Structure formats: structure tokens, C-alpha cells
Amino acid sequence: MKKLYSFLAGIVAIILVLWGIATHLDSKINSRDSQKLVIYNWGDYIDPELLERFTEETGIQVQYETFDSNEAMYTKIKQGGTTYDIAIPSEYMINKMKDEDLLVPLDYSKIEGLENIGPEFLNQSFDKGNKFSIPYFWGTLGIVYNETMVEEAPEHWDDLWKPEYKNSIMLFDGAREVLGLGLNSFGYSLNSKDTQQLEETVDKLYKLTPNIKAIVADEMKGYMIQNNAAIGVTFSGEVSQMLEKNENLRYVVPTEASNLWFDNMVIPKTVKNQDAAYAFINFMLKPENALKNAEYVGYSTPNLPAKELLPEEKKEDKAFYPDAETMKHLEVYEKFDHKWTGKYSDLFLQFKMYRK
């Protein structure tokens, strides 16, 4: 009997040793996973040195994956089967994702540095109270022009209809953008759901067609940089890259009204490492890191202490940091339901067909 007890005791000891080894290995694996952060962001939308600095300061390794459109990002997160701890979508997509329960509500007890974000960039209609997102970059829709190809700077939307701009204007290929500039030229909201206002706008846009050289998306950069068009309607973020390559280009935000856009940090429901996600948010809220990122990417930072550290000519540039009066007249694109999304798309298609 003693031999049997000894044998059983030996078996139990072996099991305990094996269990201990397995637990240790599992702990090491989990520890290694807990020290990894997976970021899903636009391409070339962060200074790579910041990712290295984040790892040095926190010990957390970064896996950086990119998308080329909000829709591509949304589809991948919606389908599941992925692990993203941080994503950086635009404002209208944040609205959609929170409504579809794809985002984790933020725990502000874990966030440090929110006071660095300007109050004008918080509590926007797409995320009231910033329950799901923290501003990363922001910008405007405006007019980029080549000062050697125009006699007067086109500072207002109505200027685009001047006859001297025949076959000179590039428009961004988007229903909200084109109909929005038309609505704004009347002083209407770019989120208008007034049928009469929309009809007036389309009629006015028909009269713009002789001045339109092309309706494009990414191709606008090439046209403007290579002096192949005098004027373009596009986003400030795109313009910052154009200005670096063509010293004759200028950018203006029409003071009467225009679009205000945001790209914000969110934590998707695909998150595996929330602690690392909050560590990254806090890291990017530090002024020195927001400054480095703004200088690398060239976009406008919502971090006020970081903005104050920019070169004087940059932070005083009203093209990228409009004054308070201009900011009052800027609107974000509100989320439309299926009916109004379809309405705008149909009107935009009519406009493009008329142009042909």
C-alpha cells in the first residue's frame, strides 16, 4: 500500500510540475501579448520616431497597420476577427461606428492631458461629450490656388463662378463637398435637408460647369503641384503636402462658411489591450509628441500647447489655423440617414451628368 501511495504521490508531483510549467509559459505569453499595441491608422499619418519613443517609454511594442479609406477601416472592424487597440477614423465614421456599437466608451479616469485639447475641438455633434473619441488632427475644406495663374485670389465660394476661371477649377469628387460649397455660397448649411435650397444649389452648380477642368480625388495633388490647374477645392491636409512642392500655391478658407473635419483616436470593440490603448492616447496628448507629429504630417493639431510651440509663421497661418470668427462659420458633416445620403448622391450624379 505504501508503494501505491508513493506512486500516486509521484504522479501528483509530476502533474503539479507540468501545471506549473504550463502556467508559467501561459503567463509569459499573456505578458508578451499585453505588451503589444495594435494601431490601425491612415498611411504615413504618424511620425515613425514617435512609435519608437512610445516603446522606449512604456516597453509596449507597436504593430502599425494602415487603411486608405474610412470605409475599408469600418468593414474590417465590422467583420471582426481582427485585433485593433486604437483606430483613427474621421468624424462621420465615428458617428456611424458608435451608433453600431463598434466603439468602447472612454474611461476618463484613465486619460491624462485632455485639457491640452482646445475646447472648440471637443463636444462636436458627431460625438457629444467625446464619449468615444479624442481629437488627433483636424482641418478644413477650402480653395487652393496658383497665384501665378489667377489675377485675384479666389477668397469666396462665389469667386469660383467668375468667367475668367473657365476650364481652370478642380473639384473634389464628393457629393457632400460639392453640394456643400454650393449651399455655403448661398449662406445655407452644408447639412441642409431643405429641398428648395438643394434645388437652388444644383441649378447654381450647373452654371459652374464651364469653369470645371476635372472632378477628381487624389489626382488633384499632381494637377496643382505641376501647374496644370489654377484652382482646386480640397482639404487642408492635402494642401499642406502641395505647398511643400510648389511655392506658388496658396490656400484660403472662405470666411462665409465651410467644412470642419476631424480625425480622432478611438478604441474599437476589437481591442485586446485597453491599458496599452490608454497609454497611447495619453502619450499623444503630451504637447511635445503632438508637436512632433504635426511637424511630420503637416496637419493642424488640436493640442493648444503644441500649437504654441510651432514656428510663428505656421501657427499664425490662417489657412491652417483660422481665426475665431472663421471658425464660427465652419460645420462638420452630420450623419445622414439612407434617404438623405441617397438624395445628395443622386443630385451629385445629376450634376456630373449635366457637365458631360
Ranges and model annotations:
Residues 1-14, 21-23:
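N-terminal Sec-pathway targeting helices
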Residues 7, 19-96:
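Early extracytoplasmic/lumenal segment of secretory-pathway proteins
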Residues 83, 88-228:
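Extracytoplasmic ligand-binding site segments that recognize negatively charged/polar headgroups
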Residues 93-96, 225-226, 231-248:
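A ligand-binding cleft/hinge motif common to bilobed small-molecule-binding domains
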Residues 98-105, 127-131, 241-253, 315-318:
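Ligand-binding "clamshell"
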Residues 198-207, 245-269:
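Periplasmic-binding protein-like
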Residues 268-328:
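Mature extracytoplasmic/periplasmic domains
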Residues 324-356:
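Conserved C-terminal helix/tail region of periplasmic/extracytoplasmic solute-binding proteins
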